[in-house]
Amino acid sequence: GNKLFFAINHLEGHALSPSIENKISFPYLLLLVSGGHSQYLIVKGVNNYKQIGTTIDDAVGEAFDKTAKILNLGYPGGPNVEKFSKLGIKDSFILPQPIINRAGCNLSLAGLKTDVLRKSKNLKSNKERYNLAASFQETVNKILKKKTEVAMKQFRNEITGKSLKYFVVAGGVAANE
């Protein structure tokens, strides 16, 4: 039998699901964080997006997966880093925030992940592993908070006459606190 297939872009599904499920009106700012993609998008309508930032190396989800692997926390990385972070102290390790002060909304997480790998070689206990997981997650949060503030400014500059009513976070890593 002949079957009818519809091509649906996975990322477009993430981008549009908030407007479908929650009756969110356009335009809105979207942070898409998944294993393969980390992007700031201004969503102006169906099939009408402008990417204003992306990761220049590892996607956020990829960094979580690799950190979970380095710390032997199991897969999938996002939920496990989250779970073990709750057992740790989030400011026990000072970790780098690459390109945090560079203009624009691009993200870089490779240097952060490399530092986690370097520090993981000297861990003496599970407690220290959980502390490093918590510090990693907290550092990612700080990076995303700073870059989101930049993205919000860019949104306001671009969409004049409309206030930023909605900031949406979508993708697998959106579940992390």
Region locations from a protein language model:
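N-terminal small/polar loop signature for handling phosphorylated ligands or for N-terminal nucleophile
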Residues: 1, 18, 154, 158
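Conserved phosphate-binding catalytic cores of ATP/NTP-utilizing and phosphoryl-transfer enzymes
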Residues: 3, 8-29
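A cross-family phosphate/adenosyl-ligand binding-site feature
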Residues: 5, 30, 75, 94
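Small/polar loops that bind or transfer phosphate-bearing groups
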Residues: 7, 32, 171
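Glycine-rich phosphate-binding loop plus the immediately following alpha-helix
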Residues: 9, 22, 44-89, 113-124
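Short beta-strand scaffold segments in enzyme catalytic cores
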Residues: 16, 30-32, 38-42
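A contiguous, well-structured pocket-lining segment that forms one wall/lid of small-molecule binding clefts
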Residues: 82-167, 173-177
